[in-house]
UniProtKB/Swiss-Prot annotation:
List of residues binding ATP: 11, 59, 87, 93, 104, 114
SMART domains: NDK
Molecular function per GO: ATP binding; metal ion binding; nucleoside diphosphate kinase activity
Gene Ontology annotations for the cellular component aspect, listed alphabetically: cytoplasm
The name this protein goes by in its record: Nucleoside diphosphate kinase
Amino acid sequence: MVIERTLSIIKPDAVAKNIIGEIYTRFENAGLRIVAARMLHLSKEQAQEFYTVHKDRPFYNDLVGFMTSGPVMVQVLEGENAIARNREIMGATNPKEAVPGTIRADFAENIDANAVHGSDGSGTAEQEINFFFKSEDICPRIG
C-alpha cells in the first residue's frame, strides 16, 4: 500500500458553478482524504509561476488568464495511490474524451475550462504542494 499526496485545484469555472462540494464528494468516495485546503484568487504572477512548465506552449497566456479569472479551491489529497486515483476520477484533459462519470465529463465545459487540475507525478505533486502549502498547513488523516 503506497500512501501518496497530490495537489488538486478546482478551477474558476467549477468554483463559479458552486460544485466544490460535489467534487469533494468524488474525492472522498474514491478513498482520498483532504489534508489541506484553501480558496484563493491567483495573481497573474502566481499563475505564471505555477504554470511555467507551459510558458512556451501556445495556450499559456489563455491558461494564465483563465486561472486568474476567479477564485480557485486548492487542496492536498492523501490516500493509496492518490496521484493515479485523482487523475482517474478527473478524467481526460479534454472533457469530450473523458469517460462518463469522471469530473471533467460531468462538469467541464471544454478543454480550456476543464474544471480541475491534478499533479501528474510524484515529483510534480511535491513541487505543486509546496507551491501552495507549508508543511505545517497539512493535517495528515491516515487511519
